[in-house]
Each structure stands twice: as structure tokens, then as C-alpha cells.
Amino acid sequence: MFKSLLVFITFALVLVSFNHAPESAANEYIEQYKDLAVVEMYRTGIPASITLAQGLHESNYGLSKLALEANNHFGIKCKSWWTGKTYFHKDDDFDANGNLLESCFRAYRSTVDSYVDRSNFLMQSERYKHLFSISKDDYASWAYGLKESGYATDPQYAQKLIEKIIRYELYKYDQSEDPFRHLLKD
């Protein structure tokens, strides 16, 4: 009886720790990068909620190998014209026989560089230009627009971003004051 109870308690603790880990990691990620997301929102018009949701999703709360070893928090691949640092990682590219290939991803000196480059990537790419006519307060249209424009292959990508925005109340960062407002006063 005691042994069964001990096994049950151990199992319950393991389940709680697994369920707690993403919440804890998500909250730490948000706390660490929320200001950067707001700065990028005012620099580019991309909602901070979308930036944080993508960062959480694409980097697995900042814990993915790509985020930890290449500072790439958005899963941006190299493309043929990329001249910066690179990092090779198996993702979603297959050869003709169905074998998973290593994909070339952009590597960054810092997470700040990853955030800035991702914003620039969206602003400079023709396929994302239409997103910039959407209000920074309309995170749902941004999420669906990113998916429809081909940002991700996951058919549930937009819903996953929206789910994170609602779950972690990321929409509140879209209402943040411009961090440079005080510099613009006479």
C-alpha cells in the first residue's frame, strides 16, 4: 500500500513538473523579451504580441537548440542571399527519398540581433508587405496573415500564435507606451 502511494505521488509530481515547466519558461521568456518586442513594435509596426508569440513558439520558450546555439528565436532560414553567420539544423526539409535534411538557418550574435533581423525580414519581403496595413492592435489578422503568406508550414500556425497571445495576455503589450516618447518631447 505504502509503495503504491509513493509511486502515485512520484508520478503526480513528475506530471506537475512537466506542466509547470512550459509555464515557467514562458513567463521567463516574456519577462526577458517583452521590452524588446515593444521597441520593435514602435520601430516597425509589428504587434509586440505577435513578436512574443512567434518567439515563444519558434524557440520553444527560448529553450530550442536553434535559440540556444544560434540565437535564432524565429526559425528564419538562410535563403540564397544571406551573407551572415549560419547554423545547420534538421527541421522540415526532405530530399527526394523522404530523408530529413539539415537546413541552413541564420545565426546571430545576440537575441536582440535575432529580433531586429526578423522585423527587417518581414518589412523587406514582398510577401509580407500587406501585413503592415493591418493595425498593431489586430493580432489575429497578423497571425492569419503570417500563415497565409507562408511564414510557417504548420496549418495550425495562426491558431497556435493566437492561443499563446490569449493564454499569456500578450495583447497587453500592444497597448504599451512608446519607450522613446520621452525623448521626443521638446
Tell where the protein language model's regions lie, with residue ranges.
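Catalytic cores of secreted/periplasmic lytic hydrolases that degrade extracellular macromolecules
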Residues: 2, 11, 15-186
